[in-house]
């Protein structure tokens, strides 16, 4: 959903580890494995974080513009290594031309590539949204399934994308969305020591009440964009400054 930042000219961008622009990582498990009970201190830290985020961002929600579950599914696939702002610029025309899975499944790949080129990794993304649309038509009657395993079986859909769609559109807490911001903030706040998105998600699922999973991600993303930015975070403005250990933050 969020980009890790711009890269210098001539420097190659690497795709996300857990869910790439090309789709799911072949090593990505269907769901995080159960872990031993978390440390009470970590649970207390998570409780503090949830409380402050609720106060700061009570109305936080998914920033990807959409009218249907299908549109959110496609927009989330496009958001890999791309900002939500850019995706929201691209999708109105994309969905005007191909509003549903049947129309998108029939679209020529070359036309899809041209329509989404500015989102990056457009060759793979175009193939994925076309194949995903075809899968929805063939397997689910053109409807987005309300099932995690069925979603991640579709082309280009990993746990992050599935969690976004299920949580945002259907109110189903199937996991914690871990994007660039959630991963960065979780490490800085000492909620995880992991760098892999699936492992971070497992840690957060252990620490957070299930009822908080969906909103927690939205609020962390808002905070990561506005305050706890990647470089030179605005710690003096942060409501969590007093209890944040600032792991990895350089003075």
Residue spans for each PLM region:
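Polybasic, lysine-enriched low-complexity intrinsically disordered terminal tails
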Residues: 1-40, 250
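Catalytic cores of DNA base-excision repair glycosylases
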Residues: 34-251
């Amino acid at each position: 959903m969020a980009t890790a930042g711009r890269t210098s000219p001539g420097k190659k961008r690497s795709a996300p580890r857990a869910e790439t622009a090309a789709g799911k990582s072949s090593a990505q498990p269907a769901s995080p494995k159960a872990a031993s009970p978390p440390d009470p201190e970590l649970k207390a830290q998570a409780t503090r974080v949830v409380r402050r985020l609720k106060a700061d961002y009570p109305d936080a929600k998914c920033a990807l513009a959409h009218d249907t579950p299908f549109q959110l599914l496609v927009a989330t696939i496009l958001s890999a290594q791309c900002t939500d702002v850019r995706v929201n610029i691209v999708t109105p025309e994309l969905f005007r031309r191909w509003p549903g899975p049947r129309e998108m499944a029939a679209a020529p790949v070359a036309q899809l590539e041209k329509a989404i080129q500015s989102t990056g990794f457009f060759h793979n993304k175009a193939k994925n949204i076309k194949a995903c649309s075809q899968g929805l038509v063939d397997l689910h009657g053109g409807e987005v399934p309300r099932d995690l395993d069925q979603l991640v079986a579709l082309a280009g859909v990993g746990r992050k994308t599935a969690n976004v769609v299920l949580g945002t559109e259907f109110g189903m807490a199937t996991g914690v969305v871990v994007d660039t911001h959630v991963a960065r903030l979780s490490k800085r706040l000492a909620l995880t020591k992991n760098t892999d998105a699936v492992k971070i998600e497992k840690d957060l699922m252990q620490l957070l009440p299930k009822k908080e999973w969906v909103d927690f991600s939205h609020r962390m993303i808002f905070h990561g964009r506005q305050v706890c930015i990647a470089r030179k975070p605005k710690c003096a403005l942060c409501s969590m400054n007093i209890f944040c250990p600032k792991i990895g933050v350089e003075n």
